[in-house]
């Protein structure tokens, strides 16, 4: 799926956030644990999927552009998480970030 200019700018911020948090997005790295545009069984693509130490999906990260409240992607991200058997979701527009454990409640703001 094509990414808008604003969403691309948001993704730059999200990439920085992930790297500062210890996640590896380098496609040439053997330690890479983040996949971008990760295919789901239904044929759709999750913006990002964070992988566990065994390479299995752990968390779906849905990216939106700066101008959009990331919470609008809540149901879309839940669909991806369910398809990929992920318990955790991050919703972000590069400025606002929410963490959601779909087994225990609603998204919470993170910084």
Where are these regions (language model features)?
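Accessory nucleic-acid engagement/destabilization modules that flank
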Residues: 1-111
